[in-house]
Structures are given as C-alpha cells and as structure tokens.
Amino acid sequence: MVAFDANEILTPFCEGHREGAILFDCQRLRQVEYGLFVPAWWGGRAHAVSEGGRGSAWFVEASFGNAVLRQYRRGGMIAMLNRDRYFWCGGHRTRSVLEFRLMRELISRGLPVPTPLAACYVRYGVQYRAAILMERLEGVSSLAMCVRGNSKETHWEQIGRMISRFHREGLDHADLNAHNILLDQAGQCWLIDFDRGALRIPATKWRERNLARLLRSLLKIRGERSVDAVYRDFERLRRAYDLAWSRGC
C-alpha cells in the first residue's frame, strides 16, 4: 500500500472539450500546465530518447532541471488498434498516477529510483491518455548498452544486490529488462519504468518471474552467438542476488 503524501497536489484542467488532471510534487514544481506533457510544447528543448521504449519518451530541458517525459503507449498486436488509450477506472487508477505514487513510495524506502515530478491524464469518455514527467539521471548507461560492450564483473554483482533490495521491499516489476536498469559512472545502479508495477508480499513465484524476464532480455540483446556468455554473466548476478536475499539486504 502506498502511503498518503502531503507534498502531492492534484490540479484539474480542461484541454479543449476534454477533462483531465495533473498530480505533481509541489516541492519541485511551483506551477504546472498540460503543455509540460506534450513534446511539441518544449520545442527544441525536447529530444527523443533513442534507446528502448516505443518511441514514447523524450529528454526535456526545463527550468526545474533536466527531465524525462514519457507518454504511455501500448505494445504488441493491440497497439495496431489502440496505441495510447486505456480503459477509464477513475483518476486514482490511471497508470500515470499509480506509477507516480509507487515511485515516491519506493524513494521513501531508500531505493534507487529517479524522482517523479508530475503525472497527467486526459479523459476521453470511457478511455484516457496519460503521461509522466520525472527527473533525468545524468551520466548513466543502461545495462543493455553495457552488455553490448564489455560490462565489468562488479556490475553484475551490484545489479543482483539492487534487484534483491527491491524484491525485499515487495516490488514486483512488470518489465524488468536490460533497458530499465541503469548504471552511473560510480557504479551506482538504478531501476526505472514502474508502469504496472506493484508492491506485494515477497514471494518466490513473482520474484523468479522478474528474473526470468531479465534473462530473456539479455539473451535477446546479445543474440544466439553469445548464449554461453549471457548465462555466465547472469550466474554472477544470480549469485549476488541470492546472497543478498539470504542476508536480508
């Protein structure tokens, strides 16, 4: 369960004939408007993120600091029919609001997560669109980028320990893959993209599901010719994960 946060402000707005709302961190942002969630509003200060995702993320240069704007998009076959609309179940159940609040809860627990700045949704009858704005982590590379080069052995151990920390807090990450694990120049690991994530009672089934998804991601990135290397590297990660889990850290 995500606790109430007194620093959150929910501001309703109208966009044309549509109604929506913006949930934001009043300590980081003094004013908000719908344009913050539209790449064209930023003009030359918005740059598309080239790696991962579905062409739905931009780096933006803002007065409150560099940030990442991500619009929620569907994947798979359903995206051919409905790219970016979701069934309306109430504002508090929109994907952007849920992710914003989950990230703030994870930060309150001391976990390495970028700071969410604002979340937005616009209603379209029984459907809605959504977007989220968060702090940009500077000087980081994704695990996907690292494995295409020469990733250091210590990275695998650090990543394994980081995942164990999140799992011990009950985070079931819906899309744990190599694009969503970041490392900075000091070796610090970060986890991103908490869409559809949830806090649960720690259990073997969903923890193993997360780890299996990460392994599939690594195999996909490095290809069939690197299968043995992928399994060797992942075994290092897994040993560090298991050791951290057994020690309760």
From Swiss-Prot:
EC number: 2.7.1.166
GO-annotated molecular function: ATP binding; protein kinase activity
Similarity section: Belongs to the protein kinase superfamily. KdkA/RfaP family.
Its biological purpose: Catalyzes the ATP-dependent phosphorylation of the 3-deoxy-D-manno-octulosonic acid (Kdo) residue in Kdo-lipid IV(A) at the 4-OH position.
Subcellular compartments: Cell inner membrane
GO terms, biological process: lipopolysaccharide core region biosynthetic process; maturation of SSU-rRNA
Pfam families: Kdo
Annotated pathway: Bacterial outer membrane biogenesis; LPS core biosynthesis
Keywords for this protein: ATP-binding, Cell inner membrane, Cell membrane, Kinase, Lipopolysaccharide biosynthesis, Membrane, Nucleotide-binding, Transferase
Protein's membrane topology: Peripheral membrane protein
Protein name in the entry: 3-deoxy-D-manno-octulosonic acid kinase
Cited PANTHER family: SER/THR-PROTEIN KINASE RIO2 (PTHR45852), SERINE_THREONINE-PROTEIN KINASE RIO2 (PTHR45852:SF1)
